[in-house]
């Protein structure tokens, strides 16, 4: 079975640093090598960036993070997640333009000029030995200005279909890595950077040994939640007799928890509801079946754990890249894929009732065969090679 969601850690307080400024500052040794990590927007960009940032710090690097600040009402995810982990947080004013109206596009040249200038200020102040771009629109102005200022640029593309920013930056980057094969010309296929917890879980056969009773179901909608899954899953579970119903943990996304709670109450179904999952690796390992979207990080994490997944790709994903992500595992027997338009409460209820744990073990085993677990180490090695 197959999915999307990228998990998230609970959001600590957002930083209040001004645009072009630095929020949290690390205490590091004088003369340490310096990396500037550019990533933002969603967990799919941020969590791989954190994996690399933490590994670099463990090797004595001083790491700064460049992202967007968001607004007072809706701070960016990176401004919430990065500073509490001890990294200096820099911000510039730039966000996505794809699908925006004509007014936003009309002001794009001015916004770009401002973002270019802010990026120059950040790069000059931080003085990085290496700049790493892990996606998000924020990477475009900062990546271009880094190269203009003579800095080495390392890129990583998480998805099976390259994003617009990386398509542009690949021509000026020193090293390019991808999570899936054949995504960018002359790139090295290494998989997605992972936090160590995902590679330390017992294998599927060991985890499933001795499990009996109702299935343990985990529903994750990614770092931003998934309204369609929040609406559909409670209705499907209500169609299953209570004595045969799975034991459910459902991650809602920060802004959708109350709506999800109302959906389960209306369906008369009990479930553990949470806006975020702090330890996603353990949650994947504990579940018999994960219902999720098919963001690149989620697919990578599913493979690393060897979890069984039902992927429901986000239908509005750019270039339908979530379907392509999911097929990387599903085509090898490492999960199941159902498009959102084809998934009804009745169909999901039927699938859950007929699913056997033995089949889920096989999904997990096949998914695990597709894992690549050295992406973080290879990106760190590239940075150290460049910085010599």
Feature locations, PLM:
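Donor-nucleotide binding loops and adjacent catalytic segments primarily
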Residues: 66-80, 85, 203-204, 208-290, ...
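A short, well-ordered alpha-helix in the C-terminal region of glycosyltransferases
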Residues: 359-373
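N-terminal subdomain of nucleotide-sugar transferases
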Residues: 2-16, 21-70
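Active-site-proximal region of nucleotide-activated glycan assembly enzymes
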Residues: 62, 88, 147-205
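An amphipathic, basic-hydrophobic alpha-helix
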Residues: 97-130, 148
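Conserved nucleotide-sugar phosphate-binding/catalytic loop shared by glycosyltransferases and other
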Residues: 32-40, 57-111, 254-256, 341
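Acidic donor-binding loop of glycosyltransferase active sites
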Residues: 129-130, 285-300, 307-308
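C-terminal alpha-helical cap of glycosyltransferases
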Residues: 373-388
């Amino acid at each position: 079975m197959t999915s999307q969601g990228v998990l998230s850690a609970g959001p600590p307080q957002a930083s209040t640093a001004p645009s072009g400024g630095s929020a949290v500052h690390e205490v590091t040794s004088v003369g340490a090598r310096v990396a500037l990590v550019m990533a933002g927007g969603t967990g799919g960009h941020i969590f791989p960036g954190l994996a690399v940032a933490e590994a670099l710090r463990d090797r004595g690097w001083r790491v700064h993070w460049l992202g967007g600040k968001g607004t007072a009402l809706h701070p960016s995810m990176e401004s919430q997640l990065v500073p509490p982990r001890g990294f200096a947080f820099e911000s510039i004013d730039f966000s996505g333009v794809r699908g925006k109206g004509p007014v936003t596009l009309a002001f794009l040249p001015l916004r770009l000029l401002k973002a270019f200038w802010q990026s120059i200020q950040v790069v000059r102040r931080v003085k990085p030995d290496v700049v790493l771009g892990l996606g998000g629109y924020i990477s475009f102005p900062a990546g271009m200005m880094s190269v203009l200022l003579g800095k080495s640029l390392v890129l990583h593309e998480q998805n099976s279909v390259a994003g617009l920013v990386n398509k542009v930056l690949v021509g000026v980057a020193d090293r390019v890595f991808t999570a899936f094969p054949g995504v960018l010309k002359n790139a090295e296929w290494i998989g997605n950077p992972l936090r160590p917890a995902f590679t330390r879980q017992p294998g599927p056969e060991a985890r499933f040994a001795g499990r009996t009773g109702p299935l343990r179901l985990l529903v994750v909608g990614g770092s931003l939640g998934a309204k369609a899954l929040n609406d559909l899953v409670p209705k499907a579970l209500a169609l299953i007799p209570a004595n045969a119903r799975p034991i459910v943990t459902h991650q809602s996304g920060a802004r959708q928890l109350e709506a999800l709670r109302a959906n389960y109450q209306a369906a008369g179904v009990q479930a553990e509801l949470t806006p975020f999952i702090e330890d996603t690796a353990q949650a994947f390992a504990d579940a018999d079946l994960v219902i999720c979207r098919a963001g690149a990080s989620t697919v990578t994490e599913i493979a690393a754990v060897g979890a069984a997944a039902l992927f429901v790709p986000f239908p509005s994903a750019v270039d339908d890249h979530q379907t392509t992500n999911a097929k990387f595992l599903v085509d090898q027997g490492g999960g199941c894929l159902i498009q959102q338009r084809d998934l009804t409460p009745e169909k999901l209820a039927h699938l859950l009732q007929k699913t056997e744990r033995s089949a889920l073990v096989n999904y997990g085993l096949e998914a695990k065969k597709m894992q690549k677990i050295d992406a973080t180490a290879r990106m760190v090695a590239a940075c150290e090679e460049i910085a010599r």
